[in-house]
Amino acid sequence: MAPGALLVTSQNGRTSPLYDSDGYVPAPAALVVGGEVNYRGYHHAEWWVGNAKQVAQFYITRMGFEPVAHKGLETGSRFFASHVVQNNGVRFVFTSPVRSSARQTLKAAPLADQARLDEMYDHLDKHGDGVKDVAFEVDDVLAVYENAVANGAESVSSPHTDSCDEGDVISAAIKTYGDTTHTFIQRTTYTGPFLPGYRSCTTVDSANKFLPPVNLEAIDHCVGNQDWDEMSDACDFYERCLGFHRFWSVDDKDICTEFSALKSIVMSSPNQVVKMPINEPAHGKKKSQIEEYVDFYNGPGVQHIALRTPNIIEAVSNLRSRGVEFISVPDTYYENMRLRLKAAGMKLEESFDIIQKLNILIDFDEGGYLLQLFTKPLMDRPTVFIEIIQRNNFDGFGAGNFKSLFEAIEREQDLRGNL
């Protein structure tokens, strides 16, 4: 071991070198992690976008986020700018290049920045604005990373420590479906606003002083769309490399309309704090919403992120007041739902009339119910959107709403000429 190598002790009690003077010291190929690694939840989602500052402002003014940290020319980042916004437990990072990808520009960049700049421009050209990375906070980065790589995951960055005056953070990253990545984050002693290298935002955005608040709790789940016959391989990756299990699934018999269909499997971390639904298209008369996404995103990627709220009526009302556009649900859905709720003896705490007025969808079983609503796509490409969700003793994913939801999205698809 090289002098000065950093040692990290994993949950199984094994002390390993994280890196030495020549770089990361890889784990044995046959490594099996002892014990179950604890996933703490989603740490953040990073979006690669054309103009990070403007996109951050959209989430601040439209969705009630607050600016918490940034990185850019002012902090010594010469080629990229990142703006971090947060709403309670929901963190989004928006990153853009601030220099051209022209060769003469790249000559001045370190090799790592050259590669990242090239990748970012390729990503923006291929996908448009989209989610590049979904980051998980874990108790043991070393164990999660080693287990993933030993079971076939492709490394993006090996475990390393970033330090600043506010403490240390250990992180690593792997590839998942398409061009999407997962970063593992372990906040060992860190007390800062986001991650080392970011500067805290000290002022509150003035727009939020004049707009109704939006109370979000956390990222509930993050959905990935796959191309034809790719769902099984994606789910196998989460089982094999990350120790996830199949939590819930529906097939094309359950999610179909007159024109199109899809299949979906929800993958969950062992402790069920992280859930990653995986969709793929199924055969129908016309193009499904999954096919439309894959066509315009040019491959698999994150379709939507569900944000949990304790009060969806207040959240959706205030989001609408701020200018957020949601899908429309026909009155016939609510006529049928009122009868279903009455037949099942299910009583909602919320006013049914207000739920209908706001176009909120309802699903339920004998134990509880779920309220949810979906925004329209957030950019001109019909790709990524946001879900607002409230759970009342209900762990499902709105299977009872899939047909109505699919039909609502198809109406938007038809307006775009993509059905």
From Swiss-Prot:
It holds the Pfam family Glyoxalase. Pathway: Amino-acid degradation; L-phenylalanine degradation; acetoacetate and fumarate from L-phenylalanine: step 3/6. Residues 41-187, 218-376 form the VOC domain. Fe cation binds at H221, H304, E387. Its cofactor is Fe cation. Binds 1 Fe cation per subunit. One of its GO terms (molecular function) is 4-hydroxyphenylpyruvate dioxygenase activity. It catalyses: 3-(4-hydroxyphenyl)pyruvate + O2 = homogentisate + CO2. It is an enzyme of class 1 (oxidoreductase). CDD domains: HPPD_C_like, HPPD_N_like. Keywords: Dioxygenase, Iron, Metal-binding, Oxidoreductase, Phenylalanine catabolism, Repeat, Tyrosine catabolism. Its EC number is 1.13.11.27. One of its GO terms (biological process) is tyrosine catabolic process. Belongs to the 4HPPD family. This is 4-hydroxyphenylpyruvate dioxygenase.
